[in-house]
Amino acid sequence: DDHDEHGDHEEHGEEHGEERIFSSTDQESFTAKGQYNLSSNFLKSIEYTYRDTDYELVEAHAEEEGHDDHDDDHGEEHAPTIFTNDATEYGAIFDISTDNLIQKIAFNFVDEDSAIVGEESFMNPANNEEFTFGYFLSADLDAFYLDAGFRLDQIERTGSVTDEDHGDVDYYNLDDDTNSFAISLGRDLTDSLNMNIGFASVERLPSVIELYMNGPHLATGRLETGNPNLKGETSDNFDITFNYDDGDFFAMASFYINDVDNYISLIDMHDDHDDHDDEHGDEHGDEHDEEFAHLIKANYVQEDAEFKGYEIEIGRTFSLGSGDMTVSFGRDDVEAEFSDGHNVPRINPARNIYSLSYVENDWLFKLSLKDVEKQDDIAEGETVTDSYQMLNARLTKVFNMNGAGELKVTIFGTNLLDEAARNHSSFVKNEVPLPGRNYGAKFSFKF
């Protein structure tokens, strides 16, 4: 990201005038899954999962020209910021289905350590432990299809926040339970048309970043500050969906409304919100503000919010030659407002998606055009994002290796129109556009 705000400081003008941010990611993950089938009348099977993940993201300053010639002092001034996340997860699902009911009980445990460190402690090491119990039920009640689920989470999150001025450390512990449930009823209206109505209530506690973050996040261009006093979110969602399929013609329409109490969002702070008490403006604080003056101050805050939107799709399948061709049109849109009437930030605009696909034996060709509309229904402090069209294509061939396995080869092209496109939901949409025209190939082998 280019930053020109330091040009007024003669001693920093040369150093920061052409500053850019570079990042690298290193992740190691090991996953083991299995299933044990039983002949018991009560317990049909047990699925089990173990996953261990080590993740590291390094964000560093670098000069566009001559960045290798800086002295040691300058190198220390721009020491990298390192995001780490080490997680271990265990899970098991017990199938206790009967002839009339599908029933499953799930247990899951996660132990996660996170930290964001650099020249200063941007987020001190934090620990997150979660134990989950879940129950799922599915039944055919003749007149309706019923799906229902319940989930209980026991969560403990511990962390600390270091005062940027005086270095004092405050320790925090969040220990709470959340309860969530969902239920849906489906009904066949005709042989080709069915309807589904669903309701879900989901509780979510703030993450360790939302609670304890306290420093610069270069990839978002923000000086982020969490809040250890954030409350949990409660989301109540109602949706209704219609599906039609007569073998050739198909259509889908889904509508939803989602009320979220205590919705947590990262909100940019503007000049009229950035006043600080003079008695705390010591030399260290001034240096801290000057060092990160090119970043936008942003706080994790919460307020009640409402999301409402829809998704539709229509299409038809034709026989063509020795294969089938499918054409379709889809559209989705969402509106989101806080309880005070202001728009929720970084909400993507409406999209129209045109698709064409052709399948013949082991060949698949797909062409899609995504028409993303202009987003001018924006939140406070946001800027309008222009519309764009994204044309993608891919051709896939599957080779059967004489019983030894299956080789899948895909040739693809994305953004074939080479549009200068920007994602409205991105914190750095102006500095980092979506990738331009590119081509590639993918290979996968299953045995």
Residue ranges with predicted function:
Residues T241, L434-F447:
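Outer-membrane beta-barrel "beta-signal"
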Residues D1-F30, S40, L57:
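Periplasmic-side early beta-strands and strand-to-turn transitions of outer-membrane beta-barrels
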Residues L141, Y256-V260, E283-I378, L417:
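Gram-negative outer-membrane beta-barrel transporters
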Residues D54, Q154-D168, N173, D191-F238, ...:
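Surface-exposed extracellular loop regions of Gram-negative outer-membrane beta-barrel proteins
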Residues T25-D188, N194-N196, A200, M252-F255, ...:
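Face-selective signature of the C-terminal outer-membrane beta-barrel domain
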Residues D4, E18-R20, K33, T49, ...:
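Outer-membrane beta-barrel translocator domains and adjoining extracellular loop/strand segments
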Residues G75-I93, G134, T225-K231, N237, ...:
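Outer membrane beta-barrel strand-and-loop segments of large Gram-negative receptors
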